[in-house]
């Protein structure tokens, strides 16, 4: 039994999200939640919410035992880039890229 939760278009770069995802891949969900709760990275809070959603999906939809669940797969894919401009000297402007990503978490026995 495998249950997924997906978050699309969150304002986090995929590279920074993968740093957090690599820390919890393959761990039991209780240990993964503990690691994410005490991580200072911005992506930790976002991935924690997605993991909690996947756990709730497994419990509600499949009737799974939470203590037996592991993080089967977790990956962070690159989303679209929001392009913004900031004013510079002499009437010029510079582009600012605001990257987004898609986070997918799958939990199972």
UniProtKB/Swiss-Prot annotation:
GO terms for molecular function: rRNA binding; structural constituent of ribosome. InterPro entries: Ribosomal_uL22, Ribosomal_uL22_bac/chlpt-type, Ribosomal_uL22_bac/org-type, Ribosomal_uL22_CS, Ribosomal_uL22_sf. One of its GO terms (cellular component) is cytosolic large ribosomal subunit. HAMAP family: Ribosomal_uL22_B. Part of the 50S ribosomal subunit. PANTHER family: CHLOROPLAST 50S RIBOSOMAL PROTEIN L22-RELATED, LARGE RIBOSOMAL SUBUNIT PROTEIN UL22M. This is Large ribosomal subunit protein uL22. It comes from Thiobacillus denitrificans (strain ATCC 25259 / T1). The lineage of its organism: Bacteria, Pseudomonadati, Pseudomonadota, Betaproteobacteria, Nitrosomonadales.
């Amino acid at each position: 039994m495998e249950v997924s939760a997906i978050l699309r278009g969150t304002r986090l770069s995929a590279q920074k999200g993968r740093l957090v995802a690599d820390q919890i891949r393959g761990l039991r969900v209780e240990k993964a939640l503990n690691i994410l709760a005490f991580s200072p990275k911005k992506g930790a809070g976002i991935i924690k919410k997605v993991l909690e959603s996947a756990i709730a999906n497994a419990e509600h939809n499949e009737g799974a035992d939470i203590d037996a669940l592991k993080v089967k797969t977790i990956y962070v894919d690159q989303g679209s880039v929001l392009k913004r401009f900031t004013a510079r000297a002499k009437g010029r402007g510079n582009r600012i890229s605001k990257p987004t990503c898609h986070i997918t978490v799958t939990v199972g026995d």
